[in-house]
Design a protein with these regions (language model features):
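Sec-dependent bacterial lipoprotein signal peptides
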Residues: 1-32
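Beta-rich interaction/scaffold domains
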Residues: 33-179
């Protein structure tokens, strides 16, 4: 009689486990049937409308950053400025452009690039540099004078996660003066 009770409980437990597994299997199928579209690059298309550059850096052929201080990114004016030491070669560098979540960049960065055309020539004023690093004042002065941007400056388009919003950013390089 005792073995019959144990066998009955084992049968009940098997049925319960089977029901749980069936429920989980059905739930998994229901979730996997949702349509998650992908773009031509195989990236997930989301509902995110954010579309901006959050950081900008350049690396030399030794894979070391050539950035001096912090890059200045103005998401309203769609301008990214990176500062380098005087005389730093910028003709064979690898850009690293950080974007908001789910966004992508066009054109894609697939090779070393020449950023010489993005170099700005400008006159500096008191307060542009603090302890050898660029100040926000300098970035704001540059952004507020778009007529001074080189016509050959690098341009990249940021495309939002929903793939509907596109914003073109201008990437500029400013050399710190000799000190």
């Amino acid at each position: 009689e005792y073995t019959m009770v144990v066998i009955k409980k084992l049968d009940d437990m098997k049925k319960m486990i089977n029901k749980i597994c069936l429920f989980l299997f059905i739930a998994l199928i229901a979730v996997s049937c949702e349509d998650f579209p992908v773009d031509e690059d195989g990236l997930l298309i989301t509902t995110r409308a954010e579309c901006y550059v959050s950081n900008f850096d350049l690396y030399n052929t030794d894979h070391q950053t050539i950035k001096l201080g912090n890059a200045y990114v103005d998401t309203t004016a769609q301008v990214a400025i990176m500062y380098v030491k005087f005389g730093t070669p910028i003709n064979n560098v690898w850009p690293r452009i950080s974007l908001c979540e789910d966004a992508k960049l066009a054109p894609k960065i697939t090779d070393w690039m020449d950023f010489s055309g993005s170099k700005m020539n400008m006159e500096f004023i008191e307060g542009d540099w603090k302890s050898g690093n660029p100040s926000d004042q300098l970035g704001e002065r540059i952004v507020n004078n778009p007529s001074a941007f080189p016509s050959t400056a690098k341009r990249f388009t940021v495309i939002a996660g929903n793939r509907e919003i596109k914003k073109e950013y201008i990437f500029l390089i400013v050399e710190r003066p000799l000190q």
